[in-house]
Amino acid sequence: MSENIQSVRGMNDCLPDAADAWQGFEAIVRDWLRRYGYREMRTPILEHTGLFKRAIGEVTDIVEKEMYTFVDELNGESLTLRPEGTASSVRAVIQHNLLYDGGKRLWYSGPMFRHERPQKGRYRQFHQVGVEALGFAGPDVDAELIVMCADLWRELGIAPTLQLNTLGDHGARQRHRSKLIAYYEAHRDVLDADAQRRLHSNPLRILDSKNPAMQALNAEAPRLLDELEDEALNHFDALQGLLRANGIAFEINPRLVRGLDYYNRTVFEWVTDQLGAQGTVCAGGRYDGLVEQLGGKPAPAAGFAMGIERLLALVETSGKPIVPAVPDAYIVHAGDTADAFAWQAAATLRGAGLAVVLHCGGGSFKSQMKKADASRARYAVIIGDEEAAAQQVSVKPLRGTAEQTRVELALAIEYLKKA
């Protein structure tokens, strides 16, 4: 016997029970985004490597360590499986000139790929829902992004904590960068290897260190908030006012910098400790320079992305798991006339919008009823030769104590829809 081939480590199959929960989540998300006026866009999972190097930053963990990159043997191009969705979205917006008539509210969903060490809630293929608001410069759209997240959390029955910061504008970041380098140079003897490597190339990333020893050093590091110019400070103050007016609680975290270089001004994360170690379930902010950086005309932009696997795990801990859709009916049938009529009945019920499983494989009524119950359908629609001859069906509730009833096929539609 040949050896079984397993899935790639960190890339998981989504089996039917899990897929049911995913579909329920996706239906909630689609309706939520529709209510806020966001429109879906879909981009390829494979992009030119240069897109991510330019957008995310070459001195980042994602680009340096985590991307799945290969050379296309046909033409020698370097290609990468997308590690995140914003760069691809902005590339598509520029390529198709979507901002020609004003701002756009867009969203995407799909798999992303990072070569990380697999662990709970962190996989090499993972899935995100992302939102991009392009062409809007004010703090009001920043607030909208955060408020809409809070609305979704309420609908899902979860309560992550909002952490908020601002990265200011270019001048503030440059002044802060100089002070960070001087600070860390003065403590060079206690810097870990990663901080030593980033000291002159990207010192802001040191603030994002997960090393406890570095976190203690970072607690005393110069604050970017102290370097803000009036315009950026007013933007941040206005955002906080809008959040308070909408009843959104938040914590200011001056060490929150995000792991991608394209962010400026507002950055935020929704975090939880309900999945063990504190983890981020949603993160975003402004990236006003990214459109121009990728070759488009200058345009402000903001957005966020949320991890579907982590959100579903968090929903499971809330005590309000997403209830998957189940079939409306399972058709049980036996007898030559009944078998033929069962096909007609299934087509009629499905044509009326009902979800129907038609039993296949024969067997006794008893064995078929066991399969009907296992299907989690709400009703068994039972057809014997006697029912078929009369163009009728027997409808038996599989949940609760209601009695079985026999009705005309046309009436069965109304019966199943009302129940």
UniProtKB/Swiss-Prot annotation:
Q: Per the UniProt record, which EC number(s) apply here?
A: 6.1.1.21
Principal place where this protein is found? Answer: cytoplasm
Compartments where located: Cytoplasm
Catalyses:
tRNA(His) + L-histidine + ATP = L-histidyl-tRNA(His) + AMP + diphosphate + H(+)
Keywords attached to this Swiss-Prot or TrEMBL record, sorted alphabetically, are: Aminoacyl-tRNA synthetase, ATP-binding, Cytoplasm, Ligase, Nucleotide-binding, Protein biosynthesis
Recorded GO MF terms: ATP binding; histidine-tRNA ligase activity
Query: In the UniProt record, does the keyword Signal occur?
Result: no
Q: Which CDD domains match?
A: HisRS-like_core (cd00773), HisRS_anticodon (cd00859)
Q: What EC class is this? A: ligase
Q: Name one GO cellular component term.
A: cytoplasm
Give the GO terms filed under biological process for this record: histidyl-tRNA aminoacylation
Assembly and interactions?
Homodimer.
Which PANTHER family does the UniProt record give? HISTIDINE--TRNA LIGASE, MITOCHONDRIAL-RELATED, HISTIDYL-TRNA SYNTHETASE
Regarding protein family, the annotation reads:
Belongs to the class-II aminoacyl-tRNA synthetase family.
Q: What is this protein called?
A: Histidine--tRNA ligase
Q: Which organism is it from?
A: Thiobacillus denitrificans (strain ATCC 25259 / T1)
State the gene name recorded for this protein.
hisS
